[in-house]
Amino acid sequence: MDSNTVSSFQVDCFLWHVRKRFADQELGDAPFLDRLRRDQKSLRGRGSTLGLDMETATRAGKQIVERILEEESDEALKMTIASVPASRYLTDMTLEEMSRDWFMLMPKQKVAGSLCIRMDQAIMDKNIILKANFSVIFDRLETLILLRAFTEEGAIVGEISPLPSLPGHTDEDVKNAIGVLIGGLEWNDNTVRLSETLQRFAWRSSNEDGRPPLPSKQKRKMARTIESEV
């Protein structure tokens, strides 16, 4: 196993522990708590994949961080902060909407890269809006935290979430995953549109109703599927 992979996991575990202590003192805001919960799932998945214990890794990560801080000067810290581009965290959903449990009558699940797409195929003839919480850098989606599909009544009927064991995705990965979710929901005559923030940052262009144009490859794939079932 690569030593950098192990040490990276150890440092991530310790930094998560520090953030958890901060949250335990009721000092974290909603975006902070969102990321904390998601990162915990990611760390558990990575620990399982690597065969490493999180508690042991946290102690090792503490030693690594302490060693770095001992060598770090205030001037070097200022230069590091100045050189890192700042990202923004955007929220379509409340904490309640993000953490709410939901159930599917006819579940369908698909994995696309490091993203998991889930939808309820029993939903028909509904107006659906896609909402997401994500970070943005250079006016583009950087990291998806969670995307969910809501009916006008507020019911959750679909979801796109990062897989804890496979961290890392691009804005193009998210775009393709949304296309899959939209295609699945529209198959049952649902009308799907995107929130304004998704329209702006996940796509640079969309139809007037907020519905993004499907990538040409996806259109061809859907057309072949329809033809094969007729």
Swiss-Prot record:
A motif (Nuclear localization signal) lies at residues 34-38. The keyword Ubl conjugation applies. Residues 1-73 are annotated as: RNA-binding and homodimerization. Residues 205-230 are annotated as: Disordered. It is found in: Host nucleus; Host cytoplasm. InterPro entries: NS1, NS1A, NS1A_effect_dom-like_sf, uS15_NS1_RNA-bd_sf. Its main location: host cell. Keywords: Eukaryotic host gene expression shutoff by virus, Host cytoplasm, Host gene expression shutoff by virus, Host mRNA suppression by virus, Host nucleus, Host-virus interaction, Inhibition of host innate immune response by virus, Inhibition of host interferon signaling pathway by virus, Inhibition of host PKR by virus, Inhibition of host pre-mRNA processing by virus, Inhibition of host RIG-I by virus, Inhibition of host RLR pathway by virus, Interferon antiviral system evasion, RNA-binding, Ubl conjugation, Viral immunoevasion. GO terms for molecular function: protein serine/threonine kinase inhibitor activity; RNA binding. GO terms for biological process: symbiont-mediated suppression of host cytoplasmic pattern recognition receptor signaling pathway via inhibition of RIG-I activity; symbiont-mediated suppression of host gene expression; symbiont-mediated suppression of host mRNA processing; symbiont-mediated suppression of host PKR/eIFalpha signaling; symbiont-mediated suppression of host type I interferon-mediated signaling pathway. It comes from the Viruses. Upon interferon induction, ISGylated via host HERC5; this results in the impairment of NS1 interaction with RNA targets due to its inability to form homodimers and to interact with host EIF2AK2/PKR. Residues 180-215 are annotated as: CPSF4-binding. A motif (Nuclear export signal) lies at residues 137-146. It holds the Pfam family Flu_NS1. Residues 223-230 are annotated as: PABPN1-binding. GO terms for cellular component: host cell cytoplasm; host cell nucleus. Belongs to the influenza A viruses NS1 family. Homodimer. Interacts with host TRIM25 (via coiled coil); this interaction specifically inhibits TRIM25 multimerization and TRIM25-mediated RIGI CARD ubiquitination. Interacts with human EIF2AK2/PKR, CPSF4, IVNS1ABP and PABPN1. The dsRNA-binding region is required for suppression of RNA silencing. Inhibits post-transcriptional processing of cellular pre-mRNA, by binding and inhibiting two cellular proteins that are required for the 3'-end processing of cellular pre-mRNAs: the 30 kDa cleavage and polyadenylation specificity factor/CPSF4 and the poly(A)-binding protein 2/PABPN1. In turn, unprocessed 3' end pre-mRNAs accumulate in the host nucleus and are no longer exported to the cytoplasm. Cellular protein synthesis is thereby shut off very early after virus infection. This is Non-structural protein 1. It comes from Influenza A virus (strain A/Pintail/Alberta/268/1978 H6N2). The lineage of its organism: Viruses, Riboviria, Orthornavirae, Negarnaviricota, Polyploviricotina. The gene is NS.
